[in-house]
Amino acid sequence: MTDGLNKAAVFICHCSGNISEHVDIDAVKKTLKAEGISVFDYEYMCSSQGQALIKKKIVEGSLDRVVIGSCTPSKHGTLFKKCIQETGLNRAGLEIANLREQCAWVHPDRTGATEKALSLLRAKLKRLENVEPLDEIKVDIAQQALVIGGGIAGITAALNLADNGVSTVLVENNSSIGGQMAKIGKIFSPDKLAEECAMCSLSPLMNEVAAHPKITLLTRTEVESLSGSAGNFTIRLRKKPRYVKDSCTACGRCSRVCPVQVEDEFNCGHMDKKAISLRFSQSVPKIYCIDPDYCLQLNGEACGKCADACKNEAIDFSQKEEIVELNVGAVVVATGFEEYDVSQKPQYGYGIFENVLTQMELARVLGINGPTKGELLRVSDFSKASSDPTPATCDSRCEDSSDESQGTDTPKRIVMIQCVGSRDEKEGGNRYCSRYCCMAALKHASLIKKKHPETEITICYIDVRAFGFYENYYRAVQETGVNFVRGRPAEVIEKPDKSLVVRVEDTLDQKMRELPADLVVLSAAMVPSPGTRKIASVLNLSQDESGFIKERHSKLKPVDSSLDGIFVCGTAQSPKDVTDTIAQAGLAAVRARAFITDSPKVLDNEIATINQLLCTRCGECLKCPFDALSVNESGRVVLDPLICTGCGYCTKLCGEGAVQIAGFTKLQLKAEMEGVLEEGDVLGFVNSGIASLTCDNIGNSVLTYPSNVKLIKVPTGLVVDRDLVLHAFRHGASSVLFVEDPPDNPRAEVIYPLTVSHFEELKEELGDSGNRIYFKKAYVPNTKGLAGTFTSLAREGEMIR
């Protein structure tokens, strides 16, 4: 690109005051214009009008370099790249200065924020002086999608994709799809002011999945790893055996003769099942499954009764685990939630007192195929029976509970405690509202009142959050005689007869109350399932501080994950009810289909480049931990762009400087340092992955740090050598901090130890100056700790300044 600054311009976004209220944009413009730089500002640079302004000025001024001062590049980086490319400008000619998350939002001092904004813009201008055009790398996108999780979100996404012609693989780690919705018995219908059978809605969809020609269903299967790049992901799956062939007719003979009883997780442990069983009566696929942890035959004891009983010869003890590899263009994550572990709140007696349940456990008690066959009983009053191998199906009985009685009294007094583990800033709690708990309590209260109007029900609440049409449902439940006490109970006490007392302060009349109860039901928070936490790690997806998978932008890209080509929906993304889950799953499917059909795809080519003139064929770079480099037939080192992660380890290995990362060359990094640094500054080299997101989240979390902390994004700290660190010191840096991704995903598990070793080597190489470099592992939830590190180092820098 041309030399000099006459072909460059700066565009500054006000961001509706998010930037302009903290940064004096007029002062920034005046200073830059005095330096001979064209500067333009607009209220919303990301809007169609803002983009039109950028394109107009590029064409009018024959610009070949553009700096946009706006929010973090992770929000609108792709949008702005497309914007400038529409004018014919190479995307390498764009730099985005983060004036919001890493300036305006973290520096309350307007003068300091303005000075830093100037330095960030100057740094990007300097960086562009050394830019080289990036060639486009195009690849065809695999025409297959993967949906992870077989609950209502995964089912909805898979059917939407398949119905629109996309070949889809649906993976579920349990023996049946259905997820949590299969357990809840009833769903509330606010428009009808009634409750409806959940399985009546879910079961047809499950069967549609099984029969769909475009869907491959893999149960008892987990995702082990992901490699490749967006549009061409290689997914490695581990499929566990059922020990039952597909020829199983689900007659139930095997289960009837099985001598082993195990706790039934589907019924929350309040019922037993056999070691060979269906997960529930409407399971899909409707094939029995043997639990290898409890099966006598699989644990070396002579049994085989199930095999003897099976007339279809479907029992197969020889089945082994399988490894399945898929090539997919897009992934939808729908791994769901689990209930908060309410035993973390021992004051409520869960796990101590028999008659304290969660709402999910109550749902199973009220279910016709639950431990009491739908009869409302205290746990202490019913015996733990084995599940029927051919239990009740979803027929007319879903509108009525069983007439069978276990000869005990229905609980006369029930107390429900809301927000257990949510809206709770104490240890073990979660700050967020789980959104579904209030409605679940109202639903169960309504169901019980309709069948047992004499039962007294009291709901202890902080606020009843019933939005939209749900307010009508809330009022309808109130009219049935359900009592509401505003207050968070202090404790639950058990009496000798197993009855309970709930102590609570009613904050409306400011009186302490002792509420007698035969049954206490805890509305537990919705937390990420183990599968959600695991898949976020395996796929290297950003998570919020609570462990839910974080969307790229809550408004503009609510189902896009932090990685291109991977989408998230349902309760894997945040707490929500069935209605919102289905809506979001449909959107995720639309986004995944659009991504797959947009073929060929232009790759992000911030990957390794090899200068063949400098390369001595020493072979050191072939130690790439991802095997992205190889030697071709002519003896040249070549790169596989689909494998290269752009980590920069090869740049460290190459002693000739023949390998560099496109967009992060030494010249570019040095120029950016020269533009941003002043005497006494703290310079942070920030990994462009999780670490960069964590830095952005400092601003999102309304935390602050001094304005003499300057951050430069790098692929990883491996691209920063001794020469670059010394360059930083020569240009005023008091200290240099390496901020790296934690080793909590497969890629980072490889790279993190390399960055640690590299850092230790640098300290040694730098001698006395090694005491001025620091290393920080950045977890997304630890924004406060990272801000504290910045502040501590900045104070040392102020002393030098």
UniProtKB/Swiss-Prot annotation:
Subunit structure: The ferredoxin:CoB-CoM heterodisulfide reductase is composed of three subunits; HdrA1, HdrB1 and HdrC1.
Family assignment from sequence similarity: Belongs to the HdrA family.
Database matches in PROSITE patterns: 4FE4S_FER_1 (PS00198), 4FE4S_FER_2 (PS51379)
Gene: hdrA1
Stimuli inducing this protein: Induced on trimethylamine or methanol, but not on acetate as the sole energy source.
Entry binding sites for [4Fe-4S] cluster 1: 248, 251, 254, 310
Keywords annotated in UniProt: 4Fe-4S, Cytoplasm, FAD, Flavoprotein, Iron, Iron-sulfur, Metal-binding, Methanogenesis, Oxidoreductase
Name assigned to this protein: Ferredoxin:CoB-CoM heterodisulfide reductase subunit A
